[in-house]
């Protein structure tokens, strides 16, 4: 596949993610496409089922505040040193979103089941926790190879869309994600993967032995958009730092405002 077949504008990328889609998103520290999130908010997407791989932060809070989300499936929603996620917290208190509590190992294991094409996967660590009472789709059963050894069976988790950011893509649609291997799992598990990248380079990343091991092959990528500082106001490792002033301003405003969109460093919009 050549990039001409998969290269999209940011609004075209957002239009490829339908209302009601199950969308896998990485945590704040792992190459988030905030530029795509803002595009989704601009087009007023509705009814999203967000999957945190394994947790969520600013992306989810922004989408919830804009009224784009029906369901969250994640191990946590946190803004790290910025504190609680204000729009998420308000939505939960008002019972405006459906929460599917999970754990980090459960999210990763269920995605691995989808990646491998198997219908379910066993996991031990959930037994004895209260979370099982809230996840009727998780079943406790016997280990078929041992006696008196219960395990939890998790159904495969197959997102409709994985949405990520990355430092580099190439004209063949290959995407280099570096050490952030959860993006690779997301792309393998999801039906489609859309990526924003800092730069589209000449050549083939799969031909470079130093880059190949950390590159998602283009066959897993449904669309790619070149977006400089596409993770802003978050940062990317080895690229640019998070815009702490802007993030704090968001947190302060989001405590009382429902809608957040932003396309420039000096542009924060909210609607009471």
Residue positions per predicted region:
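Internal active-site segments that recognize and position negatively charged phosphoryl groups
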Residues: 134-175
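Conserved small/polar residues in nucleotide/adenosyl-binding loops
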Residues: 1-5, 260-265
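Conserved acidic residues
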Residues: 70, 158-160, 191, 222
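N-terminal active-site beta-alpha-beta segment that forms phosphate/nucleotide-binding
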Residues: 6-102, 189-191, 262
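Positively charged, low-complexity/disordered segments
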Residues: 264-266, 270-272
């Amino acid at each position: 596949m050549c990039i001409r077949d998969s290269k999209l504008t940011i609004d075209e990328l957002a239009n490829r993610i339908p209302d009601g889609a199950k969308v896998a998103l990485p945590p704040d520290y792992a190459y988030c496409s905030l530029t795509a999130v803002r595009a989704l908010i601009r087009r007023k997407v509705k009814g999203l089922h967000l999957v945190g791989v394994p947790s969520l932060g600013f992306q989810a809070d922004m989408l919830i505040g804009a009224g784009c989300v029906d369901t969250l499936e994640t191990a946590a929603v946190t803004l790290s040193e910025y504190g609680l996620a204000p729009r998420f917290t308000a939505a939960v208190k008002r019972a405006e979103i459906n929460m599917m509590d999970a754990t980090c190992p459960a999210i990763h294991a269920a995605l691995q089941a989808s990646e491998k094409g198997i219908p379910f996967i066993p996991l031990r660590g959930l037994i004895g926790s209260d979370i099982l009472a809230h996840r009727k789709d998780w079943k406790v059963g016997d280990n078929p190879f041992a006696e008196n050894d219960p395990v939890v069976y998790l159904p495969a988790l197959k997102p409709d869309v994985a949405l990520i950011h990355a430092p580099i893509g190439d004209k063949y649609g290959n995407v280099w994600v570096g050490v952030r291997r959860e993006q690779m799992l997301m792309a393998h598990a999801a039906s489609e993967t859309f990526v924003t990248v800092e730069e589209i380079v000449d050549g083939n990343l799969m031909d470079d032995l130093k880059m190949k091991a950390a590159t998602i092959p283009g066959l897993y990528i449904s669309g790619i958009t070149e977006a400089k500082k596409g993770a802003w106001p978050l940062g990317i490792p080895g690229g640019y730092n998070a815009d702490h002033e802007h993030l704090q301003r968001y947190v302060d405003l989001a405590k009382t405002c429902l809608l957040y969109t932003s396309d420039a460093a000096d542009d924060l919009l909210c609607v009471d």
